[in-house]
């Protein structure tokens, strides 16, 4: 994006350096040249989309292990011990693929669009509107 901005500023600077300062009126040739320059620069000024999406549809998963008072062997952490209560606690962060079944996606879509599937004891407000 910075390179595009620099290119546009360089183009504008070069056009300003060679602009005829003595003539006050623009003729047809100058208008066509200006339109051509604008047509070249216009695609460079388009905003680019965000590219933060993970290609494999993975998301960070945070797992907290608290084994204080538990007699089981702690196998999640393999680093050096601190010889206090932190030896029985561990936080694990991993990137895992997130999958959703097509049936669940269809149910959610129906819920968002038409209010068909809702939770238990939740009134459906889409059918409560008065029809005049």
Swiss-Prot record:
Chain sites annotated for binding (2R,3E)-phycocyanobilin 2: 68
Gene3D superfamilies (alphabetical): Phycoerythrin alpha chain
Residues that hold (2R,3E)-phycocyanobilin 1 according to the record: 54
Source superkingdom: Eukaryota
Entry's localization field: Plastid, Chloroplast thylakoid membrane
Annotated 15,16-dihydrobiliverdin binding sites: 123, 125
Membrane topology reported for the UniProt record: Peripheral membrane protein
Residues annotated for mesobiliverdin binding in this entry: 70, 76-77, 92
A GO CC term attached to the entry: phycobilisome
GO biological process: photosynthesis
One family name in Pfam for this protein: Phycoerythr_ab
PTM annotation, UniProt: Contains two phycocyanobilin chromophores, one mesobiliverdin chromophore and one 15,16-dihydrobiliverdin chromophore with binding mediated by both the alpha and beta subunits.
Alphabetic keyword roster: Bile pigment, Chloroplast, Chromophore, Electron transport, Membrane, Photosynthesis, Plastid, Thylakoid, Transport
Family, similarity comment: Belongs to the phycoerythrin family.
Protein purpose: Light-harvesting photosynthetic tetrapyrrole chromophore-protein from the phycobiliprotein complex.
Complexes and interactors: Heterotetramer of 2 different alpha chains and 2 identical beta chains which form 2 alpha-beta heterodimers within the heterotetramer.
Other remarks on this protein: The light-harvesting system in Cryptophytes contains phycobiliprotein complexes. Unusually they are composed of either phycoerythrin (CPE) or phycocyanin (CPC) but never allophycocyanin (APC), with only one type of biliprotein being present in any one species. Unlike cyanobacteria or red algae these proteins are not arranged into higher-order phycobilisome complexes, and they are found in the thylakoid lumen.
Stated name of the protein: Phycocyanin PC645 alpha-1 subunit
Species the sequence originates in: Chroomonas sp. (strain CCMP270)
């Amino acid at each position: 994006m910075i390179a595009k901005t620099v290119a546009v500023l360089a183009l504008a600077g070069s056009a300003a350096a060679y602009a005829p300062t003595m003539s006050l009126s623009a003729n047809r040739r100058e208008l066509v040249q200006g339109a051509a320059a604008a047509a070249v620069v216009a695609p460079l000024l388009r905003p680019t989309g965000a590219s933060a999406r993970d290609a494999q549809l993975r998301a960070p998963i945070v797992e907290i292990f608290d084994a204080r008072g538990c007699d089981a062997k702690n196998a999640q952490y393999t680093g050096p011990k601190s010889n206090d209560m932190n030896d029985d606690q561990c936080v694990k962060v991993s990137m895992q693929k997130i999958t959703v079944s097509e049936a669940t996606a269809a149910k959610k879509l129906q819920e968002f669009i038409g209010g068909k599937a809702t939770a238990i004891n939740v009134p459906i407000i889409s059918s409560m509107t008065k029809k005049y």
